[in-house]
Amino acid sequence: MEKLTDLNYTLSVITLMNNTLHTILEDPGMAYFPYIASVLTGLFALNKASIPTMKIALKTSKCSYKVVKYCIVTIFNTLLKLAGYKEQITTKDEIEKQMDRVVKEMRRQLEMIDKLTTREIEQVELLKRIYDKLTVQTTGEIDMTKEINQKNVRTLEEWESGKNPYEPREVTAAM
């Protein structure tokens, strides 16, 4: 354990890797060498940092699978960020949390739609009742004789002499 966390040991291994790469790739026109060296250095540093961390986490935690999974996901996300990707790896727990949040939001929206639909139905029923009260309904023929005091009106055939007494007559006056 001491050997894994020893800084001098880590630096000597990095120097050894760089020297090995320099001897393998002796071409001075090699343009990608610094990038390859930095990636390998980063991978080595991640290896040296993650192994002791995982050993300690496995010894101290009760649920080792979740810790290992979280460490691996964190390492891969770090590598993706170093490579310039914006995407991240998510675990099933995070996906389930997001799905629960989406389902909860959908339920809330469905409840809101249900409330609004109920209110709209109540408003339509109220408008229908108001419309029914405002519309003119035909009740058939209305007896208007009581309204104009003509209950005893007779027709021409009903008069005794056969003439209407209210019909105007010609009147001649003497001068």
Curated annotation (Swiss-Prot):
Impact reported for residue 63 to S: No effect on receptor activity nor on oligomer formation. No effect on receptor activity nor on oligomer formation
The keyword Membrane is assigned to this record: yes
PTM field: The N-glycosyl content is primarily Man(9)GlcNAc, with a small amount of Man(8)GlcNAc.
Location, primary (coarse class): host cell
Topological domains annotated Lumenal: 1-28
Record has Membrane as a keyword: yes
Cellular component annotations (GO), alphabetically ordered: extracellular region; host caveola; host cell rough endoplasmic reticulum membrane; membrane
Xref: SUPFAM superfamilies: Rotavirus nonstructural proteins
Membrane spanning stretches: 29-51
Span list, region ICP binding domain: 159-175
Cytoplasmic side: 52-175
Topology relative to the membrane: Single-pass type III membrane protein
Known partners and oligomeric status: Homotetramer. Interacts with the immature particle in the viroplasm. Interacts with host CAV1, early and late in infection. Interacts with host integrin ITGA1/ITGB1 heterodimer. Interacts with host integrin ITGA2/ITGB1 heterodimer. Interaction with microtubules blocks trafficking to the Golgi apparatus.
Record's comment describing the protein's domains: Binds 1 calcium ion per tetramer. The coiled coil region mediates oligomerization.
Similarity annotation: Belongs to the rotavirus NSP4 family.
Function: Plays an essential role in the virus replication cycle by acting as a viroporin. Creates a pore in the host endoplasmic reticulum and as a consequence releases Ca(2+) in the cytoplasm of infected cell. In turn, high levels of cytoplasmic calcium trigger membrane trafficking and transport of viral ER-associated proteins to viroplasms, sites of viral genome replication and immature particle assembly.
Name of this protein: Non-structural glycoprotein 4
